[in-house]
């Protein structure tokens, strides 16, 4: 292919020539060659397109014309998406700002994910969005991950380190308390990401050689061991500043001192150690004075050698804590707890209650009900203003936060807690509005429609609900006297002592209504049915209409207190008092009616249960009958199949016997015998012998044996004939090819006859005293 051998310079020359003359109409040959060149040199064209900014001979108007008149759709898409202008933003990591004509699909995915996060739709759309690294606030020079082949893992420590870190936002305050090996550990607010049991991403950036997997001696477990040793050393005396010289005894060999120094300086930088230490020196001024040196000429020279380590790259002040180590020790000493573990938990709770507060992780303002919770760190939350202004915490972006609306959560949680008064209002609303849940929710007043429906479904359909609901006391106090009236319990039995059976006032339904008995009957008629309500009304009426001596005596006793109760006296048409019903009697009647209704409902329930059992048994019997009918039908079909099989077997045996008889008749015919002179010819020329037919078994010629042999074979039950019948039966069952009777010939070889009938004779001797032992010619036409 001559086009494959073209050089890169030729392809670039063609590209530039075509780009300078985009409007010229090329000839068909040139157009086809240009298309072929573009197809063959796609890589060269891409490299030329990348380096098109270096071509100073092409004017800007030519580029515009190229965008308008280019015929290659791939080039049009590439040039239309990204403009050639580029502005460098950062040298490390390399970041370039480019102008685009239309957003990339990844940008659209990020915008959709941010909108869903702001709307509180969950993290389903966030999972599909690309991973972003925020370089706007505090992360312009922070690497989120270090690859195993990164330059920072080089063994040469004299080279400048590629680790660059931006100072965190200092958050002055009381700090955050954490548990570390049974002791309290106070860290700054901006170091709340630290956890003794895990390794944070910022820690992996400081000592990446422990997490690259290149060295078997440097493992994450070893890093955690060194880090925890340093922190434990500091917690022995938090008021004293821990220096690197004091930590050198924590490692066994000098090769680990460099890693230990980086760990100590990192922990000191973030305030994980020396946060409560007093007398700390302003590290920024100390480093500034140590890096500047005045030359004899009077010029100031900046020393770059110390900047090779992390110590020179992080230049910011130490975080200061408003608390002192004595405050923590005083709190620990004042706690009067016997159990050590329980004391630590209680002390931790006290310190957290005093030091920590629910505030924004960036501006430290108290969080409102609407805020944004981090998906990476559980203790990081932002207020609405900081989130919308993109003031994120180090290592976070907008996709790492989830919208939290406290009002919605509170309303959902409140839907699970119902007071007795709200439950009563719900039952009253159901009784009043039937199934109109909007009116029921308005009647309750404090719950929504869905919460009312959910709570009503969860209510137990038992009398235990009424026992747990507290109803305000009635205006008339309850009396234990029953005036001798019989009391019916839930089972309908009569009890002699009413005070042991009558429940208190707060356990009777509709006790505060003007007529408790009628209210109960009406409720049962609408909820349970007219028959249950009729039994309740009948029992209550029987109690109210009992006329005995005790009632007459009670009328005289209650005459002084007429009109005081909630139930007025009944008067006749003449204006006289006809009867007076005491509140206790009304309660007794309501309870008896309720017991009768419960008994009636129980009877109906038992009747329905028996009906269900009867119907279930009927269904099962019908299914069993269907199964029996199917089994009977299958048995009949099986019987018919067996009969057909027997008939087919008899027909097969008859056909086999007929076939054997016909074959025997053909073989015993005198025309099959040949002169003896042909025997030598057949024996001398074995190739002239016709092959044995496939359908005739090897023992077929034995059917025409002489009488002495035949008699001998008959005396032993004809084994050869049985074998012949078995072979014929197998041939009929095997669906193999069938040969006509005319094709069956007797062509026994001399060796076969000698072996069967004269095994003692040599193979060269062929007796001709019997017709079966004489060989026949292959061209005998008398057979068939």
Curated annotation (Swiss-Prot):
<dbReference type="GO" id="GO:0003677">
    <property type="term" value="F:DNA binding"/>
</dbReference>
<dbReference type="GO" id="GO:0005634">
    <property type="term" value="C:nucleus"/>
</dbReference>
<dbReference type="GO" id="GO:0006325">
    <property type="term" value="P:chromatin organization"/>
</dbReference>
<dbReference type="GO" id="GO:2000070">
    <property type="term" value="P:regulation of response to water deprivation"/>
</dbReference>
<feature type="compositionally biased region" description="Low complexity">
    <location>
        <begin position="24"/>
        <end position="39"/>
    </location>
</feature>
<feature type="region of interest" description="Disordered">
    <location>
        <begin position="1"/>
        <end position="68"/>
    </location>
</feature>
<dbReference type="Pfam" id="PF04433">
    <property type="entry name" value="SWIRM"/>
</dbReference>
<feature type="region of interest" description="Disordered">
    <location>
        <begin position="667"/>
        <end position="702"/>
    </location>
</feature>
<feature type="zinc finger region" description="ZZ-type; degenerate">
    <location>
        <begin position="355"/>
        <end position="409"/>
    </location>
</feature>
<dbReference type="InterPro" id="IPR036388">
    <property type="entry name" value="WH-like_DNA-bd_sf"/>
</dbReference>
<dbReference type="InterPro" id="IPR007526">
    <property type="entry name" value="SWIRM"/>
</dbReference>
<keyword id="KW-0862">Zinc</keyword>
<comment type="subunit">
    <text>Interacts with LFR. Interacts with NMCP1.</text>
</comment>
<keyword id="KW-0863">Zinc-finger</keyword>
<feature type="binding site">
    <location>
        <position position="360"/>
    </location>
    <ligand>
        <name>Zn(2+)</name>
    </ligand>
</feature>
<feature type="compositionally biased region" description="Acidic residues">
    <location>
        <begin position="43"/>
        <end position="66"/>
    </location>
</feature>
<keyword id="KW-0539">Nucleus</keyword>
<dbReference type="InterPro" id="IPR017884">
    <property type="entry name" value="SANT_dom"/>
</dbReference>
<keyword id="KW-0805">Transcription regulation</keyword>
<keyword id="KW-0238">DNA-binding</keyword>
<dbReference type="GO" id="GO:0008270">
    <property type="term" value="F:zinc ion binding"/>
</dbReference>
<feature type="compositionally biased region" description="Polar residues">
    <location>
        <begin position="1"/>
        <end position="10"/>
    </location>
</feature>
<dbReference type="Pfam" id="PF00249">
    <property type="entry name" value="Myb_DNA-binding"/>
</dbReference>
<keyword id="KW-0804">Transcription</keyword>
<feature type="compositionally biased region" description="Low complexity">
    <location>
        <begin position="675"/>
        <end position="695"/>
    </location>
</feature>
<comment type="function">
    <text>Component of a multiprotein complex equivalent of the SWI/SNF complex, an ATP-dependent chromatin-remodeling complex, which is required for the positive and negative regulation of gene expression of a large number of genes. It changes chromatin structure by altering DNA-histone contacts within a nucleosome, leading eventually to a change in nucleosome position, thus facilitating or repressing binding of gene-specific transcription factors. May be involved in positive response to drought stress and modulation of root growth through its interaction with NMCP1.</text>
</comment>
<feature type="binding site">
    <location>
        <position position="383"/>
    </location>
    <ligand>
        <name>Zn(2+)</name>
    </ligand>
</feature>
<dbReference type="InterPro" id="IPR009057">
    <property type="entry name" value="Homeodomain-like_sf"/>
</dbReference>
<feature type="domain" description="SANT">
    <location>
        <begin position="413"/>
        <end position="464"/>
    </location>
</feature>
<dbReference type="InterPro" id="IPR001005">
    <property type="entry name" value="SANT/Myb"/>
</dbReference>
<dbReference type="Pfam" id="PF16495">
    <property type="entry name" value="SWIRM-assoc_1"/>
</dbReference>
<dbReference type="InterPro" id="IPR032451">
    <property type="entry name" value="SMARCC_C"/>
</dbReference>
<feature type="binding site">
    <location>
        <position position="363"/>
    </location>
    <ligand>
        <name>Zn(2+)</name>
    </ligand>
</feature>
<feature type="binding site">
    <location>
        <position position="386"/>
    </location>
    <ligand>
        <name>Zn(2+)</name>
    </ligand>
</feature>
<feature type="region of interest" description="Disordered">
    <location>
        <begin position="760"/>
        <end position="784"/>
    </location>
</feature>
<keyword id="KW-0346">Stress response</keyword>
<feature type="domain" description="SWIRM">
    <location>
        <begin position="185"/>
        <end position="284"/>
    </location>
</feature>
<protein>
    <recommendedName>
        <fullName>SWI/SNF complex subunit SWI3C homolog</fullName>
    </recommendedName>
</protein>
<keyword id="KW-0156">Chromatin regulator</keyword>
<keyword id="KW-0479">Metal-binding</keyword>
<dbReference type="GO" id="GO:0005654">
    <property type="term" value="C:nucleoplasm"/>
</dbReference>
<dbReference type="InterPro" id="IPR000433">
    <property type="entry name" value="Znf_ZZ"/>
</dbReference>
């Amino acid at each position: 292919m001559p086009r494959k051998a073209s050089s890169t310079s030729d392809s670039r020359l063609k590209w530039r020539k075509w780009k300078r003359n985009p409007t010229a109409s090329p000839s068909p040959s040139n157009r086809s060659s240009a298309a072929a060149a573009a197809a063959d040199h796609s890589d060269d064209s891409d490299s030329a397109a990348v380096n098109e900014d270096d071509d100073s001979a092409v004017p800007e108007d030519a580029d515009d014309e190229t965008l308008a008149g280019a015929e290659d759709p791939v080039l049009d898409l590439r040039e239309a998406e990204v403009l050639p202008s580029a502005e460098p933003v950062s040298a490390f990591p390399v970041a370039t700002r480019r102008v685009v004509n239309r957003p990339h699909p990844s940008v659209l995915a990020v915008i959709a994910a941010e909108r869903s996060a702001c709307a509180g739709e969950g993290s389903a759309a966030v999972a599909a969005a690309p991973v972003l690294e925020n370089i706007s606030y505090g992360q312009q020079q922070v690497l989120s991950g270090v690859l195993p082949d990164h330059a920072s893992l080089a063994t040469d420590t004299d080279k400048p380190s590629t680790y660059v870190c931006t100072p965190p936002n200092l958050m002055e305050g009381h700090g955050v308390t954490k548990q570390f090996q049974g002791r309290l550990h106070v860290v700054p607010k901006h170091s709340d990401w630290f956890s003794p049991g895990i390794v944070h991403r910022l820690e992996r950036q400081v000592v990446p050689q422990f997490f690259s997997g290149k060295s078997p001696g440097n493992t994450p477990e070893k890093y955690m061991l060194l880090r925890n040793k340093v922190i434990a050393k500091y917690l022995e005396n938090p008021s004293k500043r821990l220096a690197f010289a004091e930590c050198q005894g924590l490692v066994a060999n000098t090769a680990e001192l460099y890693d230990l120094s980086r760990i100590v300086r990192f922990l000191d930088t973030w305030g994980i150690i020396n946060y409560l230490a007093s007398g700390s020196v302003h590290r920024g001024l100390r480093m500034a004075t140590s890096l500047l040196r005045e030359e004899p000429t009077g010029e100031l020279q900046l020393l770059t050698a110390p900047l090779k380590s992390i110590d020179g790259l992080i230049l910011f002040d130490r975080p200061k804590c408003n608390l002192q180590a004595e405050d923590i020790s005083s709190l620990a000493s004042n706690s009067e707890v016997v159990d050590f573990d329980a004391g630590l938990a209680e002390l931790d709770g006290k310190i957290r209650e005093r030091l920590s507060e629910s505030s924004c992780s960036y501006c430290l303002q108290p969080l409102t009900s609407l805020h944004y919770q981090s998906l990476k760190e559980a203790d990081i939350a932002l207020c609405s203003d900081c989130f919308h202004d993109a003031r994120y915490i180090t290592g976070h972006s907008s996709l790492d936060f989830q919208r939290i609306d406290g009002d919605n959560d509170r309303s959902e949680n409140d839907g699970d807690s119902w007071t007795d008064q709200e439950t009563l209002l719900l039952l009253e609303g159901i009784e009043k509005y039937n199934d109109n849940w909007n009116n029921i929710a308005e009647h309750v007043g404090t719950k929504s429609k869905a919460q009312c429906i959910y709570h009503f479904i969860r209510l137990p359909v038992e009398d235990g609900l009424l026992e747990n609901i507290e109803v305000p006391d009635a205006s008339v106090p309850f009396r234990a006297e029953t005036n001798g009236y019989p009391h019916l319990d839930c089972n309908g039995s009569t009890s002699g002592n009413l005070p042991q059976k009558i429940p208190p006032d707060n356990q009777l339904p509709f006790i505060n209504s003007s007529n408790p008995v009628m209210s109960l009957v009406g409720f049962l008629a609408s909820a349970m049915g007219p028959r249950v309500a009729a039994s309740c009304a009948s029992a209550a009426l029987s109690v109210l209409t009992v006329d005995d001596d005790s009632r007459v005596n009670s009328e005289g006793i209650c005459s002084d207190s007429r009109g005081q109760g909630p139930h007025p006296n009944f008067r006749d048409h003449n204006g006289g008092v006809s009867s007076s019903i005491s509140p206790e009697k009304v309660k007794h009647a309501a309870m008896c009616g309720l017991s009768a209704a419960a008994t009636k409902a129980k009877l109906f329930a038992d009747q329905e249960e028996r009906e269900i059992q009867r119907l279930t048994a009927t269904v099962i019997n019908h299914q069993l009958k269907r199964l029996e009918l199917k089994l009977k039908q299958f048995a009949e079909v099986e019987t018919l199949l067996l009969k057909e099989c027997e008939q087919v077997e008899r027909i097969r045996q008859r056909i086999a016997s007929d076939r054997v008889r016909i074959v025997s008749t053909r073989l015993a015919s005198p025309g099959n015998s040949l002169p003896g002179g042909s025997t030598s010819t057949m024996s001398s020329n074995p190739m002239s012998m016709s092959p044995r037919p496939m359908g005739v078994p090897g023992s077929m010629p034995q059917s025409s044996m002489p009488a002495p042999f035949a008699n001998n074979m008959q005396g032993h039950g004809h084994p050869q004939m049985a074998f012949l019948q078995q072979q014929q039966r197998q041939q009929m069952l095997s669906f193999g090819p069938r040969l006509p009777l005319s094709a069956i010939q007797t062509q026994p070889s001399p060796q076969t006859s000698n072996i069967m009938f004269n095994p003692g004779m040599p193979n060269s001797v062929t007796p001709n005293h019997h017709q079966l032992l004489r060989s026949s010619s292959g061209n005998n036409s008398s057979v068939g």
